[in-house]
């Protein structure tokens, strides 16, 4: 269920100096529902400003939400039956962020109860400059990480995932690998992809899911953080359902 009404008051789109975010309710809770999560984020997330202007607040807000709901923003698991390499978005904390990655992993574990799911974050800077310049070197580094996982864990079902700038990184990684290597990847899932509409290089398009919300300026090649770019947690179950038959 969409939660757009939760953010109505935040859609003015005016740039301003952001204070460090503080949630009104700070008692640590169990893993939230989507609506609970988005309601809390509505208090603290920047909407209507550029990535450059909002970067610090994005990281601070995700740190607050991660602490409130005990959500891990860093994953360095061993390979599982299914292994997810995930590249977080610009300014997201840890190596998988909070807004999208953990929700996707949780949904995938629920969809695959009889399989061990291992998650590895892609260790790249996720900086504003990286986003603006196309995140080329992180793509090369992720390509090497993909080759390492394939070599060390030949029996795992490998899933590549990315959010926002992380989707750029996945695109660039695929461009640095040949088709024979990419054929060993079971699925690719991209959320809020700045390169929406471009194919993932050297890979079967039927195994790619790109989720871009209507009105997401990042998916349109822009650099404004609007409401639709912050709500991809809503699509975690859909993404997991897409991946499930490809790794079963």
Curated annotation (Swiss-Prot):
Q: What is stated about pH in the biophysicochemical properties? A: Optimum pH is 7.5-8.
- PTM comment text: The 2 disulfide bonds play a critical role in holding the catalytic residues in juxta-position; reduction of the disulfide bridges results in the complete inactivation of the enzyme.
Q: Where is the signal peptide?
A: 1-17
| Site note Transition state stabilizer, residues | 90, 165
EC class: hydrolase
User: Looking at the Swiss-Prot or TrEMBL record, what is one Pfam family this protein matches?
Assistant: Cutinase
Q: Which GO terms describe its cellular component?
A: extracellular region
User: Which BP terms from GO are recorded?
Assistant: carbohydrate catabolic process
Q: Which domain of life is it from?
A: Eukaryota
Active-site residues annotated for this sequence? 164, 216, 229
Which GO MF term does the entry hold, naming one? Answer: cutinase activity
S-adenosyl-L-methionine: present as a keyword of the record? no
**Where found in the cell?**
Secreted
- SS bond list: 79-153, 212-219
Role noted for this protein: Catalyzes the hydrolysis of complex carboxylic polyesters found in the cell wall of plants. May degrade cutin, a macromolecule that forms the structure of the plant cuticle. May also degrade suberin, a specialized macromolecule found in the cell wall of various plant tissues.
| Protein name in UniProt | Cutinase cut1
Q: Which organism is it from?
A: Trichoderma harzianum (Hypocrea lixii)
Lineage, highest ranks first: Eukaryota, Fungi, Dikarya, Ascomycota, Pezizomycotina
